[in-house]
Amino acid sequence: MDLKTQENGTNRTSALIIATISSFLSSFMGSSINIALPEIEKTFSMNAITLSWVATAYLLSVAAFLVPFGKLADIYGRKKIYTIGVAAYTLSSVLCAIAFSDISMIVFRVLQGISSAMIFSTSMAILTSVFSDGERGKAFGISVSATYLGLSLGPFIGGIMTKHLGWESIFWVNLPIGVFLLYLVTKLLKGEWAEAQNEKFDYVGSLILSVSLIALMIGMSHLPMFAGFALIFGGLAGLVIFVYHQTHIHNPLLELKLFSKNRVFAMSNLAAFINYSATFAITFMMSLFLQYVKGYEVDKAGIILVAQPVVMSIFSPLAGYFSDKKEPRIVASVGMLIVTIGLGLLTFINCNTPTVAIVLYLMLLGFGFALFSSPNTNAVMSSVEKKHYGIASSILGTMRVTGQMFSMGFAMIIISLFMGKAKITPEVFPLFSKSLQTLFGIFTILCFLGVFASLNRGKVHKI
């Protein structure tokens, strides 16, 4: 083995470890922080609205900065932006652990979200840079598997840590992991990737896009109130202005031809948006259904719900491997079809549905989502030139986050239509069950349409 081959092998291994740990860390933090929220509320005597901002501030920051940092990474170097992101994430985690008030906690969570955007926009792009077309699907599968493993372990391990070590421990654990990642990226990951280094950064476009996305996401969280619809309208208007701005400058933040002339890229991102819009609220709705309608304790409900991400983590690497051998659109489309079937089955659940059946439906969903996620990522990243890797990864991440918010928005609208502002009590269990069935029915139709978007993407080619 010559020196260059050995160095390339080390780079691939280092990049895969870096992306895998990053994926696990982000999902573990997200799922474990939800378990810790009641304890955080007690520490700072927060009301419900302020407490919700501990989670919301992070999500908004990620969504607002993903695309700008993706472009900055393409211009100044993906490794550089990733390294700064890991350092900032580690520091902001420490700040969250030593937060001294509710406001300081929210501010530090904003910083954590901004630094997470730097990591999200570059980790997959770095993987794409070091793995060839025939290898990256499997690499994506391993990284995506780590995401679902974090989602599975977060509530369990996060709950234990919060109970015995305090909620601060969830943030403190990022310190040694962050230091380890910094060592890997600075000492073992060789080279830099900045194929768009001669381009200028579009600050105006970044501002317009960030404000528009924030308005959209806050609007979705306030549905079905009038303010929610107004913010969504304002966000959509901002996106129209953003598109106009991008067509009238020399170095746009976003190459619109990626959407207009690259069907694979456009349809793969649309499929991702549809998939997350149709699936993200499932865990939220099923958690309420299991605890209220079925009467299960929180730990039993958690064990049932973990079936879905566990199956995802098991089959994602296999799905990525298949997407290297077969057309990614075929594997991803089969996955979305299986998700559609799983959603259709969940549409008919009620208080008499056996627990075993619910677990099987969730496992089917997990299997379908595993088949969809990493092949779809492979299709997106393999359809663009090297200079667009950062921005492509960021756009896909933005589709994921906005899809998640749309999913929760749909859920809030349906619950409001059936139950108004009534609390979930035995008297309204039938109404809640009806709202759940209606929502899952809508999600089934949406996901079925997504199958056609996935199939219609065509074969991968670079633009």
What kind of region is each of these model predictions?
Residues 45-52, 141, 298-303, 394:
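Small-residue hotspots at the loop-to-helix junctions and early N-terminal turns
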Residues 56-70, 120-124, 306-319:
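Central cavity-lining transmembrane alpha-helices of secondary-active solute carriers
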Residues 14-21, 33-34, 146, 165, ...:
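12-transmembrane solute porter fold
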Residues 14-51, 55, 64-66, 282-287:
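Extracytoplasmic
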Residues 163-270, 304:
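Hydrophobic transmembrane-helix bundles of small-molecule transporters
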Residues 27, 31, 97, 113-121, ...:
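Small-residue-rich segments within alpha-helical transmembrane domains of MFS-like 12-TM solute carriers
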Residues 19, 23-27, 55-58, 62, ...:
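Structural signature of transmembrane alpha-helices in multi-pass secondary transporters
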Residues 70-204, 222, 386:
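Helix-loop-helix hairpins in multi-pass membrane proteins, especially solute transporters
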